[in-house]
């Protein structure tokens, strides 16, 4: 990943060659641009991957680039596919399962510093 900064105090994150992590089997994460208030993360999930039910104080906006997932937010479950988006309010329990290989873009506010 290459980060370029100019005098105007903004940065461009080039994702070609980005450093990725595998926080758990079946999940690959790449982190894009971030600031004190925002963080963009790309997640790729293998079919059959199921994340643990969890919550965090960050508001999370999710855009599904490709694939098919089942999402549970609080007690409501729904399915999402490529082109769909949704918001998970901060401190709300949620969980995702990949019904097929899937790729999502997540935007968190404030920044999830543990992803950096």
Residue ranges of model-derived segments:
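A short, N-terminal "cap"/entry segment at the start of jelly-roll beta-barrel domains
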Residues: 1-37
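Anionic, Ser/Thr-rich low-complexity intrinsically disordered regions
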Residues: 21, 41, 73, 105-106, ...
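Conserved short histidine dyad/triad with adjacent acidic residue
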Residues: 41-55
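Short beta-strand segments in beta-sandwich/barrel cores
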Residues: 50-51, 67-72, 86
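Glycine- and acidic-residue-biased ligand/ion/polar-headgroup-sensing regions
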Residues: 58-69, 74
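A cytosolic small-molecule/anion-sensing beta-strand core signal
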Residues: 65-66, 81-82, 100
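Short acidic-glycine-tyrosine-enriched beta hairpin
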Residues: 75-90
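Ligand-binding loop in jelly-roll beta-barrel domains
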Residues: 90-114
